[in-house]
């Protein structure tokens, strides 16, 4: 595997549901659940959920771009969220659950904007694509019990993913992709 590594950061609602899709891909070194985009250093889960820190739940992905390029990460990201929802994601409401792409350099920004435009023009969604594209800010790793939740609590994870409406939405809009 290439020694070249890059970082990608995505907010897609509850971070429990954002780890597995990326974790299972070739060229992904690690996926960390955490918080970004806010004004408080080292926030806790409770603080972020209180909607007072400005952070969003997010995942930070260390990847090998020669194996799994950033463009593919973007494509996979769009397939995990409702990009037309400005109030959160699925059952999770509030600013801490709003979707966003946090770019780490100009190339990522350019690719993110182009992918958003392609999605808007694709006709998959009739409503406008409202997912934010923002400059990456400090990322704070979430508490240990949130890391790889889908592996630690598979039944709870599956109930949540289905019960929140995420699984049905993804199936309806993306099929078996």
Curated annotation (Swiss-Prot):
Q: Which UniProt keywords apply?
A: Oxidoreductase
Q: Which GO terms describe its cellular component?
A: cytoplasm
Q: What class of enzyme is it?
A: oxidoreductase
Provide the active-site residues from the annotation.
14
UniProt GO molecular function: L-methionine-(S)-S-oxide reductase activity; peptide-methionine (S)-S-oxide reductase activity
Gene3D superfamilies in the cross-refs: Peptide methionine sulphoxide reductase MsrA
Catalytic activity reads: L-methionyl-[protein] + [thioredoxin]-disulfide + H2O = L-methionyl-(S)-S-oxide-[protein] + [thioredoxin]-dithiol; [thioredoxin]-disulfide + L-methionine + H2O = L-methionine (S)-S-oxide + [thioredoxin]-dithiol
Q: Which SUPFAM superfamilies match?
A: Peptide methionine sulfoxide reductase
Documented EC number(s): 1.8.4.11
Task: Kindly state a single biological-process term from the GO annotations of this entry.
Answer: cellular response to oxidative stress
Q: What domain of life does the native source organism fall in? A: Bacteria
Cystine residue pairs: none
The family assignment reads: Belongs to the MsrA Met sulfoxide reductase family.
Q: Which HAMAP family match?
A: MsrA (MF_01401)
**Function, as annotated:** Has an important function as a repair enzyme for proteins that have been inactivated by oxidation. Catalyzes the reversible oxidation-reduction of methionine sulfoxide in proteins to methionine. May deal with oxidative damage to alpha/beta-type SASP in spores.
The protein here is known as: Peptide methionine sulfoxide reductase MsrA
